[in-house]
Amino acid sequence: MTKRLRAEDDFNPVYPYGYARNQNIPFLTPPFVSSNGFQNFPPGVLSLKLADPITINNQNVSLKVGGGLTLQEETGKLTVNTEPPLHLTNNKLGIALDAPFDVIDNKLTLLAGHGLSIITKETSTLPGLVNTLVVLTGKGIGTDLSNNGGNICVRVGEGGGLSFNDNGDLVAFNKKEDKRTLWTTPDTSPNCRIDQDKDSKLSLVLTKCGSQILANVSLIVVAGRYKIINNNTNPALKGFTIKLLFDKNGVLMESSNLGKSYWNFRNQNSIMSTAYEKAIGFMPNLVAYPKPTTGSKKYARDIVYGNIYLGGKPHQPVTIKTTFNQETGCEYSITFDFSWAKTYVNVEFETTSFTFSYIAQE
């Protein structure tokens, strides 16, 4: 014997199914429509399922229109608002292009002509320059080793005589940065030590003339036992030596008789405020004037002799002997030996100038 399935006590065989008898359902239309896009809401009412940007406006199905879109009243078409360089052509949104812009491989790009290039990781690894437009430079213009903040630099060769003046012009001679001249300035303030600190003013000018150095030297003693020469009271006082010692870069060493802070490249009638770091081109040539070694031959060309005169008087001569690279504890050296044979009585030591030249290291 089989049993029949018993219906629920509240089962209602009349459409709509599943609703309690006390619900207010104004219509009893059977659900002969698809639920895709439709809904039974409110209960008993067939309505549309809406998702943005579809909406109901004034009982009409409408479209929510945001910025950049417009619904044309005449045609009822939805259009895009454009401003140049954007435009509509053949119902397509495009961009108006003019040189040097173009579209290549569906990408907006820049047409770079001669002298211009867009840096990629394959061409340079400089930080900040990848994917940027740069100016291609040849020899002497710019550098691939540093990023100069977008500026194009002109490289000036060291020791070549070229520099930039205050106006940014490239000049062969710059009076404010004359790197062709190393000197002590023309003033008479003491800068040298003979037997005590700052007892004399050594005036020395070295000017580079190609492979030679043109030099001019003079001396004024302002203090100490050499200020006034009196060989009657001090007959042994017949000479002294001033040494200029330089390191491998041509920088004056502290152990020199000349004060280091008084020696630099020329800046008008003074010296540059920043100490120089290299001046090998002004140094005596090590082949022409070799350092003394055991058994090495000493040549007469290693010495320059001359006469200077105390007080500018021809009857008061002093011999000046200049030698090159003869000192120890340095890479290069210039040595001045001052001596006299006459007996001077109460003569002030103030000399005339002496000009000489020597072969430069570079």
Swiss-Prot record:
What are the alphabetically sorted keywords of the record?
Answer: Capsid protein, Host nucleus, Host-virus interaction, Late protein, Viral attachment to host cell, Virion, Virus entry into host cell
Q: Which SUPFAM superfamilies match?
A: Fibre shaft of virus attachment proteins (SSF51225), Virus attachment protein globular domain (SSF49835)
Q: Where in the cell is it found?
A: Virion; Host nucleus
- From its record, what is one biological process in GO terms? virion attachment to host cell
Gene Ontology cellular component annotations, sorted alphabetically: host cell nucleus; viral capsid
Provide the domain comment: The tail region anchors the fiber to penton base capsomers, whereas the shaft, built from several repeated motifs, allows the knob to protrude from the virion.
Add the further remark from the entry: All late proteins expressed from the major late promoter are produced by alternative splicing and alternative polyadenylation of the same gene giving rise to non-overlapping ORFs. A leader sequence is present in the N-terminus of all these mRNAs and is recognized by the viral shutoff protein to provide expression although conventional translation via ribosome scanning from the cap has been shut off in the host cell.
Query: What's the family?
Result: Belongs to the adenoviridae fiber family.
Complex and partners: Homotrimer. Interacts with host sialic acid. Interacts (via N-terminal tail region) with pentons.
Q: What is this protein called?
A: Fiber protein
- What organism does the record attribute this protein to? Human adenovirus D serotype 8 (HAdV-8)
